[in-house]
Amino acid sequence: MTRSVWKGPFVDGYLLKKAEKARASGRNEIIKIWSRRSTILPQFVGLTFGVYNGQKFLPVLVTENMIGHKFGEFSPTRTFYGHAADKKAKRK
């Protein structure tokens, strides 16, 4: 089920403050965030966020196509090593 329209998008309060401060300073440095649940807003376009995946901060450069999505969608938490090879097929 999606979020109700009358509630608006969810964004942690500290995230808006950090984004405003970064935009005011003009420096393009990574903003470290732990809030994977926050929605990406138009104010974040052009900024680089370090989204925590449980192990490290993955840099995410926000573009126009990302607006409305969540930060967690762009920071995978699991490592895919591939499927195990079939030993019978390998021998032939």
UniProtKB/Swiss-Prot annotation:
Keywords: Ribonucleoprotein, Ribosomal protein, RNA-binding, rRNA-binding. Transmembrane segments: none annotated. GO terms for cellular component: cytoplasm; small ribosomal subunit. One of its GO terms (biological process) is ribosomal small subunit assembly. One of its GO terms (molecular function) is rRNA binding. Pfam families: Ribosomal_S19. Protein S19 forms a complex with S13 that binds strongly to the 16S ribosomal RNA. Belongs to the universal ribosomal protein uS19 family. This is Small ribosomal subunit protein uS19. It comes from Rhodospirillum centenum (strain ATCC 51521 / SW). The gene is rpsS.
